Swiss-Prot record:
Belongs to the RNA polymerase beta' chain family. The RNAP catalytic core consists of 2 alpha, 1 beta, 1 beta' and 1 omega subunit. When a sigma factor is associated with the core the holoenzyme is formed, which can initiate transcription. NCBIfam families: rpoC_TIGR. Mg(2+) binds at D460, D462, D464. The gene is rpoC. This is DNA-directed RNA polymerase subunit beta'. It comes from the Bacteria. InterPro entries: DNA-dir_RpoC_beta_prime, DNA-dir_RpoC_beta_prime_bact, RNA_pol_asu, RNA_pol_N, RNA_pol_Rpb1_1, RNA_pol_Rpb1_3, RNA_pol_Rpb1_3_sf, RNA_pol_Rpb1_4.
Amino acid sequence: MKDLVKVLKSQAQSEEFDAIKITLASPDMIRSWSYGEVKKPETINYRTFKPERDGLFCAKIFGPVKDYECLCGKYKRMKHRGIICEKCGVEVTKAAVRRERMGHIELAAPVAHIWFLKSLPSRIGMFLDMTLRDIERVLYFESFMVIDPGMTTLERGQLLNDEQYFEALEEFGDDFDARMGAEAVQALLNDVDLDEEIERLREEIPQTNSETKIKKLSKRLKLLEAFQKSGNDPAWMIMEVLPVLPPDLRPLVPLDGGRFATSDLNDLYRRVINRNNRLKRLLDLNAPDIIVRNEKRMLQESVDALLDNGRRGRAITGSNKRPLKSLADMIKGKQGRFRQNLLGKRVDYSGRSVITVGPTLRLHQCGLPKKMALELFKPFIYSKLQAGGQASTIKAAKKMVERELPEVWDILADVIREHPVLLNRAPTLHRLGIQAFEPLLIEGKAIQLHPLVCAAYNADFDGDQMAVHVPLTLEAQLESRTLMMATNNVLSPANGEPIIVPSQDVVLGLYYMTREKIGAPGEGMVFSNLDEVERAFGTQSVSLHARVKVRLTEYDRDEDGGEWTSSTKIHDTTVGRALLYRILPKGMPFELVDQPMKKKAISGLINAVYRRSGLKDTVIFADQLMYTGFRLATWSGASIGVNDFVIPDSKKEIVDGAEEEVKEIENQFSSGLVTAGEKYNKVIDIWSKANDKVAKAMMAGISKETAIDREGNEVEQDSFNSVFIMADSGARGSAAQIRQLAGMRGLMAKPDGSIIETPITANFREGLNVLQYFISTHGARKGLADTALKTANSGYLTRRLVDVSQDLVITEEDCGTEDGLTLHPVIEGGDVIVSLAQRVLGRVVAQDVVDPATDDVLIARGTLLDEAWCARLDTMGVDEIVVRSAITCETAHGVCSACYGRDLARGHQVNVGEAVGVIAAQSIGEPGTQLTMRTFHIGGAASRASAVDSVQVKHGGTVRLHNIKHVERSDGKLVVVSRSSALAVADEHGREREYYKLPYGAELSVRDGDMVEAGTPVAKWDPHTHPVVAEVEGKVQFSDMEEGLTIHRSVDEMTGLSNIEVIESASRPASGRDKRPMIMLLDENGGHVTLPGSNTPVQYMLPGKAIISVENGGQVGVGEVIARIPVEASGNKDITGGLPRVADLFEARKPKEPAILAEVTGTISFGKETKGKRRLTITPEEGDPLEMLIPKWRQIGVFEGETVEKGEVISDGPSNPHDILRLLGVAELAKYITAEIQDVYRLQGVVIDDKHIEVIVRQMLRKVEITDSGDSSFITGDQVEFVRVLEENQRLAQEDKFPAKYDRLLLGITKASLATESFISAASFQETTRVLTEAAVTGKRDYLRGLKENVVVGRLVPAGTGLAHHAERRRRREDPESTANPSAFDVEQELGAQLTALDAEDDDL
C-alpha cells in the first residue's frame, strides 16, 4: 500500500500498481503531504511579481518559480541542485515541483467536510443517527448539543437552544457538557464505539417489523461496517487541517495593465486564511463567546465554499456576480478534470481541413495536401535531412523546410511512404469514425477522401471537415496498418454486413449498366468471348442493354482452396452484365451479376466476394466497382425533369371514391350512428387505403413501359424513367418520396403526433394550395425541431451505453457453460422478417440440435454457425436453436469468446482481448443519431398502417394453433376465448413460415392441423372493439343495470334497433357510483349457469363505454357476442417514439400503465370493490390466494373463473421488464428487450446484431438482491455484484455452509454505470460528488479492470494489445527472473538499430 501522493512525488512513473484505494485523509496524513503551512492570504507582490513569503504562492513552501534558481537569486544553475538557500529558504530545484508540492492550513477550530455532511444521504447524519437539520443547527452555531449528560436528566446528542441551555446551566451547573460547532460533532463521532454499535444493530434488525425501519437500520449498519472495514476514523469527516493545492494548479497570471487573471480557488483560499487568522487572534484575546462563535461559523462557511461552493446556502460570487469555481466544480461535469483532461485529451501531430471527393484513389489511400503533410511530418523530415547530410543542424533543416526547397519535397515523399495517417470525422459515433489511410501528396488545400468510406464516416462533401493524426511509434503505425486501415474494415461491426458499399452515383451507374432493354440495337448477337463484347460495344454496334449470347469461362475452387476448375458455357445475358463480369474476382459465379444490380444486390455481391475470395480480392473489386459505376453513371446521362413525375390517370377517381366514403361516414356520425372516435379512425383508414391505391397506380405507371420487340409485338418492360431508375436502384429517393411528388401527399400529422383527418390530395407536381401548404408545414417544422433535440439525446444515450459496457472485454476462450438463449425466427404476420438462419449466424450452438423425427444430432454443441451451416438450416426443418449468449456466459470478469461467437467486423470467432462492450454500445448508439436525423425526410406524411382485421394465409401449409382456448359457435365457426393465442402456418419441412397473433373474440374458419391453400382467409375480427363472448349458453339476466344510473339506451335511426351503453363511473349520478353493471346467464330452471369444471357462476362485468348487444331475458348461444368495448385510437409511428423508447428500455423504466401480470398460477375471482379499485384474487392449487388491487379504468382482460399461468397478462399494457425478469426469468427478459429494441430499429431499416443488445443486457443484470443471507457476509436486502455472490456461494459450498439466496435485479444503464465496482469509472460518468463521497467513506478499491479507469490513470487499456501487456506485466512481477522474451521496447530498439544499419548500407551504395 503506497500513498498515491508519494507515488506521484517520486518522479519515476515506473511504479507498478494494480489497484487504487480512496479513503478519508487523517490530519496527520495531510500534514505529511505538506511542505509547509500557509499562514498569510497574500499571493504575489504586484510590483516585483515575486511570491510573498508564507503566502498562497510562497516559494519556500512550494518550490522555486524559475528552474534551478532561488528566489533572491543567490543560487542559479544546475550545479547548486538540492541546496536550500539560507537567505530566502527556497530549495534549488525544477519549477515543476510547484505543480505537485502541497501546503496546509492549520485550522483554529475543527470544520465539518461539506461532502460528508450535505451529500445525500448525509454520512455524518447517518453515522450519528441524527437528522441533517439537527446537525446543521449544531455546526452553524444555532443550537447546543449535549455531549456528556453526566448525572442530569438530559440525553446524549440532545439539542438545546440558547434559552434551554441557560436553563440547564442554572439547574445542573457544570455536571453536563454541551457544545456547539464542529467540535461537538467531532466529540460525538469519537464517542461512538463501532464494534458495539454494529453488534447492537445486527441484533436489532431481525426484531423489527416495519419495512422502513429495517431499511434505515441496514443502511446505517452498512455505513458502520464500511468504517470498520476500511479503517477510516469517523472523526476524520471533521477536518482540523486543510490541504492547499499546489500553486501551479491554481495559477495567477499577470495581464497587461497591472491586472491579474486568477483561479477562483485563490479567492476561496484567501477567504479561509483570513477568517482562520482572525479566529486565532480572537481566541488569543479571549474574545466574547458570541464573536468567536460567529467567526467559527464564517470559517465553516468559507471552507464549505472552497470544497463545494453553492452546496449550502448561496454560492459565494466573485466580482462579476459569477459563482466561484470550487474544488468540487473542478472535477465534475463536462469541463471538469475527468471528462476534459483525463478521458479526452488534445493531441499534437494533427491537422484539419475540408474534404473533397477522391474518385481516383484506391481504398487504402487518402489525398493529403502537401502543406499539411509538411507540417505534420516535420520532425521526421528534420531527422532525415540531418541524417542525409543536407542540413548540419536542426536549425538549418528548419530553414530548408521553411523555404520549401525541392529536396524537402523529395524527403517528404520518402518519409510519407508507407506511413499511415488517421482520418477522423466528428462526431465519432462508432469505431469506423477513425480509420487509417496511406497519404498521397496532392496540390491544393483540401483532404481527398475515398467515396466508399463516406458511409462509415457518414461524411458528405458539402463542407465537412476532417482531422488528420499521425501515429508516431512503431507499434502505433503497426496497429494503424493492421487494425485501422480502411481496407481492413470492410464489414460493419454492428451487423457484419459490408459497410464499404457503393451508394448514389455508383449504384445508378451499375444498375443502368445491368438493365435490359427489349429491342435494343444489337439484340440477339452472339459473342465468343468478353473481348469481342467490349469491341462491339466500343464501336457502338451493340447497345449496353441489348440481350446477347456470350461464351464465358467460370472458375471454381474446391472447398480446401485447392485446384481451380473451369467450365465454359454460353450465357444468355446483356452486354452490360457481361462487361461487369470482367471485374468480378476469379472464382465467383456469373449469376451473381446476371441481374439488375440494385443497392441490395451490390451489397450482397460484395458480401459474397468477401466470404469466398477473402479480403484482398474484395477491396480490389470494390474499387473496380466504384470506378465502373462512376464511369457509366456519367455515360448514361441520367437526369430528371418535371415530366418524369407521371401522375396516374386513376388518381381522380380514387380520390373521389374516398371522398364519397368519408361523406357516408360523416352522415352516419351526424345521425349518431358512430362515435367521434370511430369516425376519426374510419376516416383515417379510408384515406390511408386511398393513398396506397394512388401510390400503387402511380408506381405501376412509372415503373412499366411498353416496348416493341424484334417480332414487332408490344411487350411490357421495366421503364427507363430516370426517377424510377434512381428509386428502384436505391441510388436516391424512395417510393414514399415519389408518392409525394407524383401521387398524393396523403395524411399529415400535427406537431403532437395526432393525424389530421383531411389529407393533402395534391402532390408536389400539381402544387399545393395555401391550406395544404399550411397543413404540411406542421409536420415539416416538427421534423426539423426534432432533429436538433434528438442529436443531443442520442449522443447522451451512446455515452450511457459506453459507460455501462466499457469494462466488458473478451477475457477467455470458453467458459464451458451449457446455458444459452433459444432463438426463433422473427415472424410478423405472414412474413418471416428475420429468418432463423439470419438470427443464429455467427453464434455458437449451446446444445446439440436434434432432428425431431429421427433424434439424429444435426449440429453438435460448440459449433460456430457460419454461412455454410446457415444455408443448410433452411432444409433441416429446425424451428429453434439454443445458442450461447453473453447473457448466460459464466466468465467472472468479461465474456468468453464462445458465448460471444463471431466478431462481426472480421467474420471469424472473436479474439481474446476484443472490447465487445464498447463495440456493442457504439453499434446501438450510432444509428440512434442517424435515425433521429432522419425524421423529417418524409415531411411529416403520416405513415399509418390500416387496422388489421383478418388473417389471410400467404403461403399454403398446415395450420397450427398455439396456446389457444376456443368455443364452437352454432354456425360451426370457432371463437377464440383466450388471450395470448396465435395461429401459425408451417411449410412441408415443418418450419413455421407465418405467425399471426389472434385477439380474444376472433372467429376462426379453420381448425388445428388443417391444410390451407395460399390466400385463404382463416380468421377475422373487429379491430375497433373488444368483444365479450359467451362461453356457455343461457338466458340473459341484467344485474345493476338501471336506465340513467348505470346505462343509457339510444335508438339507431337507420335500423331502428336500440342499443345499450354503460355509463362510465365518473359520469354516473352519485347513487349509481357503487353499482357494478354485469350480465349473468341463467339455465332453463332459472339457476345460475356455472363455468364448466367449476362452481363459479358466469358473470360478465361490463366496464364503462361498453355497448351491450343483448336484451334482458334474451337467449345467448355459445360463442355469441354479449357486449363490445370500444378500443382507443392509435397514434402515429415515428422514431420520435423510437429513440426515447430505446432509452426507456435500456434505463429499465417502468412504463406508465404497465401490463398487469399474474404473480402465480391459479384461478381468477373478483372480490369486493374499493373506491376506484377492483379486487382480483388468484387462487393457486396449493398455497395462499393472492390479492391484487387493480384501478377501475384498466381494461381487465380475464373473466371470473379463468385459470391463468404465472406471468400471463391480466390487464393489457406495455410490459414492465422488471416483472418479466421476476416472473419469467432472465431468458424471457433478454428476449423481450432484444425484440422491443430491434422493432424500433427495424422500423427505420437499421440492422443491428442481437448480440450487441445482449451484451448491454448482461451489464444491466450485474447486480442481485440478497433475499436470504445464509452464512454469507451479505446483509439481507443488499444489492451485490452477481459475480461476488457466485464466488461467495462457491466458497460457502466448499465449507458446507448455507449459501446466500438472491433475486436477479435489472438496473437501468445509468444506475448500472453508477453501481459499478470501479469508483473511478462511476465518478467520471455522473454524480461525481456522490460517487467519490461514498467511495471515500467505504474505503473502496478500484482494481482497474475496465477501460475507463485505466485511461484515467494513464495506462494502456486492458483490451486488444493492452490485455497482453498487462498479463505480461503481472507475470514479470510474479517472477522477476524470467525476462526471457524481451519487451516491445527492447524489440523496437533492436529493430531500429538493424534498420539504421541497413539504411547506412543503402546510402553507401
